[in-house]
């Protein structure tokens, strides 16, 4: 009993000391990193050329400290349901591997679960997208993908999907945003594709069909060291696919807003702009019902216009996912409490969204998509 009590007291006092150390300014320094860091450069990597190679969707990190990587899929299905899954690897405090799976049925009923895996149960390939977590997998070659979620890992709900790309892969320049040696990277491997396959619920299969999207992200430094937040969108209007984002750099990195806009159909790419002159953005409709009152302003509406006559309006409506990132990352409660005292509460929010596209000289058209907010403060 004495040894149990001693162990308990050691743990208690360790967390108490940690809590005191992390409160207020100490907590802020720990989370946001050092002040003396390289600023974002207006000249970004541009060496790979316009053609995306299969290896680019393979493993891009080596497992070094502070590296992270994920492969993402979302699908808007013909029956009105929405499906999202992502395979993550993170190397911040130890090595963590997990899958997030979110399914919203046509009636608005939500299912969401995170499942963690041991390092011995996961594998990757640097030659192509070949990601295996236990009996779950995400595999493909830029043209065709298979995505499997094992119902045994997700409370009886799973998928066995095929994704066939209808557009060439897209990345802005090399897809890498750097500040010194620190970087964040993004590849839209399948800007738009046709989804088919099965939804499995308690052993019963239902055929699914619709449109899908797959991208791949990786980096070598905590996201909050680079960005305050970002917004991202992918959607469809008739035959056109739209991918849009604005990355809001931290003041320490220069405080730049970096817009990205891609509009394409099977015939050509109509817009491909990355942090360029001639692309303007506006955010509006402040969110008041999802975050605490101390949170910095975040908005559910984004407008983008180009100097050559393209206008995009995006509005996030029903919430698909709204998660505190500390809770999702299984951060210990005393640290979460300390972060909260320092008014640091990062959230990830995803909306089922509407959009409109106006092209000069044409009638405006409307469509749908997925709108994401990554709040890192």
Residue ranges and their predicted role:
Residues 28-377:
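Structured soluble/peripheral alpha/beta segments that form catalytic or ligand/cofactor-binding pockets
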Residues 12-23:
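Bacterial N-terminal signal peptides
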């Amino acid at each position: 009993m004495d040894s149990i009590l001693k162990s308990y007291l050691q743990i208690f006092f360790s967390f108490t000391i940690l809590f005191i150390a992390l409160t207020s300014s100490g907590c802020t320094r720990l989370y946001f990193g050092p002040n003396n860091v390289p600023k974002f450069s207006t000249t970004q990597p541009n060496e790979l050329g316009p053609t995306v190679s299969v290896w680019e969707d393979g493993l891009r990190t080596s497992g070094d400290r502070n590296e992270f990587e994920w492969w993402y899929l979302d699908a808007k299905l013909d029956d009105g349901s929405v499906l999202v899954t992502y395979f993550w690897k993170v190397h911040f405090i130890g090595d963590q591997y997990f899958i997030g799976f979110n399914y919203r049925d046509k009636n608005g009923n939500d299912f969401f679960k995170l499942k963690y895996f041991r390092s011995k149960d996961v594998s990757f390939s640097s030659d192509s997208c070949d990601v295996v977590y236990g009996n779950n997998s995400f595999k493909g070659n830029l043209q065709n993908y298979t995505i499997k979620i094992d119902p045994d890992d997700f409370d009886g709900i799973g998928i066995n999907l095929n994704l066939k790309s209808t557009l060439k892969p897209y990345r802005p320049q090399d897809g890498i945003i750097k500040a010194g040696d620190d970087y964040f990277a993004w590849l839209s491997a399948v800007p738009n594709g046709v989804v088919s396959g099965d939804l499995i619920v308690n052993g019963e299969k239902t055929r699914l069909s619709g449109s899908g999207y797959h991208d791949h992200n990786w980096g070598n430094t905590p996201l909050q060291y680079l960005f305050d937040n970002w917004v991202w969108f992918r959607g469809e209007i008739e035959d056109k696919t739209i991918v849009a984002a604005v990355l809001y750099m931290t003041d320490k990195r220069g405080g730049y807003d970096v817009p990205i806009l891609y509009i394409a159909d099977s015939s050509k790419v109509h817009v491909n702009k990355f942090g360029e002159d001639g692309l303007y953005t506006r955010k509006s409709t402040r969110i008041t019902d999802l975050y605490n009152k101390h949170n910095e302003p975040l908005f559910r509406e984004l407008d983008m216009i180009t100097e050559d006559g393209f206008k995009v309006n995006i509005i996030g409506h029903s919430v698909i996912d709204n998660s505190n990132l500390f809770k999702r990352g299984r951060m210990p409660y005393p640290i979460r409490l300390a972060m909260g005292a320092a008014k640091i509460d990062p959230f990830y929010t995803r909306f089922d969204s509407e959009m409109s596209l106006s092209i000069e000289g044409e009638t405006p058209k409307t469509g749908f998509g997925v709108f994401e907010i990554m709040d890192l403060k």
